[in-house]
């Protein structure tokens, strides 16, 4: 798994691309200690990996020494020195938290690295003011598409005049004034063995939390059935996404044990407060195990790629709840609630003008999980990373 290497416009690497990355005078100087370093000076020490999958980083310049990390294709590294090692030249590199040796043949450097870095680096803008207007065109007199929140960050697609062109979601692109943003470029970087273990542990933890939450939901439904004398037919809920990924394609009426049959809008009938709470917890935990999976326009696969409504549709389908396919269908089919009253497991909707074009799942703590765009994939954002226009519930 790759890690991102962040460059705050100017900083430890101080890279200034010809695309217009700018260091502003009102930024904190402590973040930019070497702002005068040129692109040419820095790229003489930068390498970009060119490998089929990944190569190991070694403690010494030979293949029998201890592995200290791994680096994937198109990752950036700083070359600290070139040494003679087993089979020829090796670089001593630093990338992320990893320092070690790797054969020079696996990297490109100099002008070739500079050109490639400009294509593989991902630039982001972080809003540093409240209620920043996203405009349709790079002009202060242009129509406002939505309002962005302080601290949220967005993919930068380009620069026009004193505006950044940003991709908020795959379905929303607009312009923001540069003076209200701080930008940075991120590259993939090497990972240590400990970081690799930690990543796998976090993935397994999310899967286990989903399995535990679903088991708790089933237990709550069984207890309710016993207490109420209901002999409900249990619908199996799969916590394993590989087994359940296509479940949202089923068209049969849903039955959730402890609830009545799903209504035409997909909402289950009355259930106990305990079952409702467990359902919300399970939906959120189930959704979070797909964090980092790809965004694919028109996609409905929770593992291989989904768009915003394909993601929410698939999550709810795993619990026998039919939402509809598009964000507009889901906004219409759910029971509308106040945005201020949203709870974990409810849906928030976003629009361009009067046209709903994005949906996200509220997970609590002022955050949503959603399939945003091809750069970020399925990600967690502040609920007001753009202004929500509607909220609905499919749960009560």
Protein language model features and the residues they cover:
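SH3/SH3-like beta-barrel superfamily modules
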Residues: 67-104, 146-179, 255
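Aromatic- and glycine-rich peptidoglycan recognition patches
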Residues: 2, 7-11, 15, 20-29, ...
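SH3-family beta-barrel domains
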Residues: 2-56, 69-73, 108-133, 147-150, ...
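Short alpha-helix capping/helix-loop boundary micro-motifs
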Residues: 61-66, 138-143, 330-337
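Catalytic cysteine-centered active-site loop
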Residues: 291-344
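Solvent-exposed, polar/charged alpha-helical surfaces in well-ordered, non-transmembrane soluble domains
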Residues: 69-73, 146-150, 281-289, 309-317, ...
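Extracytoplasmic/periplasmic cell wall- or extracellular glycan-interacting regions that localize
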Residues: 116-117, 223-293, 297-310, 314
